[in-house]
Amino acid sequence: MATIPLTRRGAEKLRDELARLKSVERHAVIQAISEARAQGDLSENAEYEAAKDKQGFIEGRILDIESKLAAAQIIDPSTLDAEGRVVFGSTVDLQEEESGAKVTYQIVGDDEADLKQGLISISSPIARALIGKSAGDVAEVNAPGGVKSYEVVGVRYV
């Protein structure tokens, strides 16, 4: 099994979700199934079918998270010594060359990505273009609207 890179924060977020699924969601869906069974004929019981579907989703998500955590390589960005290069976990200050717009992103695992929070997936086109770059380098990113150029203004490990 391949390792899955996660920041400490991302691993903690997955652990919290796993605990919630096991201690709250699983019990709630079992209760919903029990209540639906009490209504009688299961062959035409929409509540029962919905609860069983939800149970399948919850159990699948539990297995998914457990698998990811078992394969996780947890990386603490503050301990990185990447000599100013962009690596997994680093926070990158960028300036879009055409518009001059400035953005800051942290490169994180797929399950941690949240663009509104400035967290981009290691698998994203922009992260792949940035890996290995240093301050002053320009990254070319194939975006849906065409190729965009970003200058790396700074790289931090926080």
Positions of predicted regions on the chain:
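Helix-rich terminal scaffold detector
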Residues: 1-63, 158
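Context-gated lysine
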Residues: 13, 22, 52-54, 68, ...
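Structured, basic alpha/beta domains of bacterial-type, RNA-associated proteins
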Residues: 59-79
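Non-DNA-binding regulatory cores of transcription-related proteins
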Residues: 75-158
